[in-house]
């Protein structure tokens, strides 16, 4: 009887959602190979393809979700190769704009400041005379000779390099002023050791206070203050008012900034290197007699000071001439624009296009 019965499909209720039977494609499952650290990128790709199934997975009648982002399985060796390749062939920048500094370096072909190597400068070699005195009467006679030479000069200003030395101890601090060195001519330096002097000779005081003498040095004002403390017959203020600090003058002429030491100023202006030996610099300057190293050290300090003064004087005169010529050819507005751009006018500029 049952074979004559017809099975009718049962209609589902309106609220029920028909469920589709999940269809699973029959096939031979692929076994995914195990990944090891020593696998090359090609082997990793083959192993990955071997374990993939192109049929989207379905669960409970839902369509399979797309596979997630594949993990980076690059080996350390592969990563190193990629990094090296990127460093050799860096990506191009989108912007082609150049700053003013990079544009000028590109046009001039000059290397960037980061790649510039420090220039090796030759050491100073002083071959002039060194006149060294330790007794009061000898110092007075020498100072009188220099004073007479100054008065014979036709120039209104006679530059004189001035420097001092004194002993220093970390236990007791700075000692009394022991040495004064001066230079009015690059061919001769005078070194006066003050150890045996209770008072400076009057002619030496007159020399450094002479109206035509322009004393100059690096941080020279502090030297005058110390000299006045150690020898009351010296007044520091008149000397400070008329002296020239070479570091300050360099900033004005070359339009640089910061504080200068004599060594750095020598590198920058004279293009020379100084042998600032700590052994000599911290030596016993009050002990008579000074040795050859001390004498050469003291002489070079004032000799190179005179060289720097002459060079700054030359640059200042050239700068004034270049500025006046530029104003005549291009006008005041162009001159101000060039100064705003950082032009120092130490070299000649005929015309400019703005």
UniProtKB/Swiss-Prot annotation:
Residue ranges annotated for the 3'-5' exonuclease domain, each copy included: 146-314
EC code(s) of this entry: 3.1.11.-
Modification sites for Phosphoserine: 104, 110, 112
Keyword RNA-binding attributed: no
Subcellular location: Nucleus
Major localization listed first in the record, in broad terms: nucleus
PANTHER family: 3'-5' EXONUCLEASE, 3-5 EXONUCLEASE
Name of the protein: 3'-5' exonuclease
Organism: Drosophila erecta
Upper classification of the organism: Eukaryota, Metazoa, Ecdysozoa, Arthropoda, Hexapoda
